[in-house]
Amino acid sequence: MSQSVGFEWGFRPSVSSGENLNMGQEQTSSTESNDISNDHERAHGHIQSSQHRLTHGTSSRRISKPRIKRRYTEEDVSMNGPVSQVVQRVSKKKPVYRNYIQGQPLPFPRSVELMDKQLLQSVLLSLVREHPEIQHSLFSKVQSISFNKEQYVKVLKEKLTQVYEDIPYSKYNQSSDGLLNDYAFGRMKASIMEFLNCVIDFLLSSIPPQSDSVLQSLKFLNCSTDFLNQLPDFETASNNYYKNMCFEQISEIWCSCIQFASTDLSFMSVVSNLEDWESVLHTLNGRSNNRLQKPLELIGTIKNSAAMMSQDRNGHPLSQTQPSTVGFLNISS
């Protein structure tokens, strides 16, 4: 019987070869000394035959250790030819740049600098629509900014120019009297509505009590009325509806400014300049087809009241020290 030595080889000899080897060893120990050489030769023959069978894989009980995978070395890569190039390409690692600079969005102040007026207005209005809670804060900020008459006039000129640019080019757009047809109104309606709404918004923000100067209010009112008279008319009466409504509102604004000026004590000594503003209104009323008749009638009422108060002062000298409530502005100042 064989004894274990504490480890196993990479292969184990077959059972038949092992038994024959043991039998040969027993025979060599029991024979006489004169047969020792023959027994050694026989045992040696059995060992060679068993090694030959194991070498050619005839044993069915071959046991081997699992082979461990290893990486290709530089020598293996150089010896394998085309295969080595593929392995080298797969196993190659790309360099990793850890300290590289990434792009970043443009800061908000720089973005605002690059925006034009239309884009900035669109972004601001969309922001207010999406977040109505900020409307009050934005409104407070805007109200703290004061705008002058020149800025108002510039914007109105641009919008009036846009109205004329929207007139379609066709010889059939105008009639013999210069009125535009329905097709032209359909093309121009958006710009006309924008102009009319802008006129009313600017006027309401430039009259008392929003404005402290009645003189500036009347001057801008005169300019706005002149712009409105330049708006084209249309053949169909319904297409002139928006323009007529705007004239009605402007007529009421004229009356409000006139009443405010007449009750302002700081202008009580300039009643003689009332004729200047009356002349301006007569000119505007003639161009607008008598749509400003109401403020003209109000001026006539104020003139009559001023004349009556003047007669009272002449008949009662003591009343001259009492302040008068009638006053107006000088358009030329």
UniProtKB/Swiss-Prot annotation:
GO biological process terms, semicolon-separated: nuclear protein quality control by the ubiquitin-proteasome system; proteasome localization; protein transport
Biased composition (Polar residues): 14-36, 47-58
Coarse class of the protein's main subcellular location: cytoplasm
GO cellular component: cytoplasm; nuclear membrane
Keyword Phosphoprotein attached: no
InterPro entries membership: Cut8/Sts1_fam, Cut8/Sts1_sf
Assembly information from the UniProt record: Binds the proteasome.
Subcellular location: Cytoplasm; Nucleus
Superkingdom of origin organism: Eukaryota
Keywords: Cytoplasm, Nucleus, Protein transport, Transport
Family classification: Belongs to the cut8/STS1 family.
Purpose: Involved in ubiquitin-mediated protein degradation. Regulatory factor in the ubiquitin/proteasome pathway that controls the turnover of proteasome substrates. Targets proteasomes to the nucleus and facilitates the degradation of nuclear proteins.
UniProt region (Disordered), positions on chain: 1-76
Name assigned to this protein: Tethering factor for nuclear proteasome STS1
One Pfam match: Cut8
A molecular function (GO) term: proteasome binding
